[in-house]
């Protein structure tokens, strides 16, 4: 598995991030787009390792993720592009690999100095920015360019952000969607 070099800054203002990136001569490479994903448990069950099938409507990927810690390089991933979201989901089902959850979020993507800057909006929690790059040094430098201190960053994965920061257990939710959350809040 390859190491990802990524950190998140929680509870951000998406407009401020966009203005800052563009002022630094970065570029927007993806408008705010709905991402849909199915997550699957691995066998044997390991809370820190899972399979993710994700699409943004244009590109669909299948990945296995393994979080080994909370540092900038502690997420391992193997990912490949697949042809179609629903067909890949049906294939997983036919292999006996059952969906753990269905999740949605919105993502806007920017590039700046070799880093990918992703503004993520998820149900029930404030937006956050994820910075991913080829090296931990580029990740930390980008955090500083955006006006943050690296000590403000976390290496927590999404599920851990929900659980440890916001006290919401999404690991046992069959779906995490904006419209279903809105219905529950009414």
Task: List where the protein language model places each region.
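Short, well-ordered alpha-helical microsegments
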Residues: 14, 139-140
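A contiguous pocket-lining binding segment that forms or flanks enzyme active sites
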Residues: 118-126
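A hydrophobic, small-residue-rich beta->alpha segment in the mid-to-C-terminal subdomain
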Residues: 136, 142-149
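N-terminal strand-loop-strand beta-hairpin
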Residues: 1-116, 149, 153-186
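Surface loops and adjacent helix of pleckstrin homology
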Residues: 65-67, 122, 134
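Short, surface-exposed beta-strand-loop junctions and turns on beta-sheet-rich folds
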Residues: 68-71, 125, 137
């Amino acid at each position: 598995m390859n190491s990802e070099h990524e950190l998140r800054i929680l509870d951000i203002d998406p407009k401020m991030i966009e203005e800052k990136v563009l002022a630094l001569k970065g570029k927007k490479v993806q408008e705010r787009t709905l991402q849909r994903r199915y997550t699957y448990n691995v066998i044997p069950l390991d809370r820190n390792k899972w399979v993710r099938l994700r699409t943004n409507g244009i590109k669909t990927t299948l990945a296995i993720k393994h979080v080994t810690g909370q540092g900038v390089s502690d997420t391992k991933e193997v990912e490949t592009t697949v042809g179609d979201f629903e067909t890949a989901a049906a294939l997983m089902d036919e292999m006996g690999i059952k969906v753990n959850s269905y999740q949605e979020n919105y993502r806007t993507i920017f590039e700046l100095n070799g880093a990918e800057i992703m503004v993520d909006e998820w149900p029930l929690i404030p937006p956050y920015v994820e910075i991913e790059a080829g090296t931990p040094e580029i990740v930390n430098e980008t955090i500083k360019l955006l006006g943050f201190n690296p000590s403000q960053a976390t290496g927590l994965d999404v599920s851990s952000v929900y659980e440890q920061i916001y006290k919401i257990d999404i690991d046992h939710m069959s779906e995490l969607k904006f419209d279903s959350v809105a219905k529950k809040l009414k």
